[in-house]
Amino acid sequence: MSRYVFTSESVTEGHPDKICDQVSDAVLDALLAQDPSSRVACETVVNTGLCMITGEVTSKAQVDFIHLVRNVIKEIGYSGARAGGFDANSCAVLVALDQQSPDIAQGVDEADDHEGDPLDRVGAGDQGIMFGYACNETPELMPLPISLAHRLAKRLAEVRHNGSLEYLLPDGKTQVSVVYENDKPVAIDTILISTQHTAEVAGISDEQGIRERITEDLWTHVVEPATADLALKPSREATKYLVNPTGKFVVGGPQGDAGLTGRKIIVDTYGGYARHGGGAFSGKDPTKVDRSAAYAARYVAKCLVASGLAERAEVQLSYAIGVAKPVSILVESFGTGKVSNAELTELVQEHFDLRPGAIIETFGLRNLPQQRGGRFYQDTAAYGHFGRNDLKAPWEDVAAKSEELVKAEAKRIKQGATV
């Protein structure tokens, strides 16, 4: 019997790097909402008293970027008396956005391999490799460690926003370690929560007293509600439970650490449980395959698991800049597939159109902000891009395609039996 512990982490929306992801995606939303054909590559950096957005934009949209940035920061919670050196109302906001390089644009606008099909005319915005993953550990077909870490981080933000724990401040991190036996989760080994807080907590000012109070409050208000519906639950007796291990966490956010777009790519995806191609998502329009093809790879992997063709599936896609068709497609089922990896790969090639133009069209990626009231991608930028029922993301809706795969496999088996 194999037994091991696997750990994943998440961060709250107030983490410096996540502030940057949300700002970059808010810029993307604002541009796409007005002009769905906008080309966007927006990077954000934050530090004490400063937020700068930079990158390349080609768009007909007219956006007040300074106002937009301040609103995102304020919504996260950095404003007023408890802003801590990073106040939405007074921080410096610098805008340094240029136009997209014409050398890149020509490859995206006119793919090298087009043959009359309009979808062949949209080339990949860059070369690269992307991975998608799904497994049957949770109802949303995500690995349990990252799923739990996101639940805790999101709940931590909720109790701050709703005032249940008034001493909480925006910055925070969670980490969950899960025990596996024969590749199945059997217990929650460790829960770690680090949360920024005020210097005084519920009238308590000594460090030990503050830590003890926060520890008890977070178990009651965060851990228990976040895990209440799970079959596998943590317990105070069996689960190691750590809160603010350094003792206190008063200085946080951009006052404590600089932040940058794209530095939480493992948090954004599968918590390290599956491979990652290295490309970040936030601030990139759908022609950037770092984002759109990663969404497609997740969709394919989830379809394979939802259809029962595999218990675990990892899908690798690769692209060349300016070329529409993927350079390669590979499926790995880790020995859990009902058919071989080669047969799964062949099934994917037959039933999924993974050209960038087709991915954009299938998921409606350019029009999502417009359809969702001017905001969509900003909400993907915290608490993960995958397994999110609250987002109603099109790459998570696999019911119809999974049924198509079931029928295709049944037909293949029937044809094989009659040969």
UniProtKB/Swiss-Prot annotation:
The record lists the catalysed reaction(s) as: L-methionine + ATP + H2O = S-adenosyl-L-methionine + phosphate + diphosphate
| GO MF annotation: an example | magnesium ion binding
Source organism's superkingdom? Answer: Bacteria
Q: Which residues bind ATP?
A: H15, D171, G172, K173, K248, F249, D257, R263, K264, A280, K284
Q: How is the cofactor bound?
A: Binds 2 divalent ions per subunit. Binds 1 potassium ion per subunit.
Look up the EC number in the record and give it: 2.5.1.6
Q: What GO cellular-component annotations does this UniProt entry give?
A: cytoplasm
Name the residues that bind Mg(2+): D17
Q: Which GO terms describe its biological process?
A: one-carbon metabolic process; S-adenosylmethionine biosynthetic process
UniProt binding sites for K(+): E43
Cofactor needs:
Mg(2+); K(+)
Query: What does the entry list as the binding residues for L-methionine?
Result: E56, Q100, D257, K288
Free-text function comment from the UniProt entry = Catalyzes the formation of S-adenosylmethionine (AdoMet) from methionine and ATP. The overall synthetic reaction is composed of two sequential steps, AdoMet formation and the subsequent tripolyphosphate hydrolysis which occurs prior to release of AdoMet from the enzyme.
Quote the subunit structure annotation: Homotetramer; dimer of dimers.
Instruction: Please report the name of this protein according to its UniProt entry.
Output: S-adenosylmethionine synthase
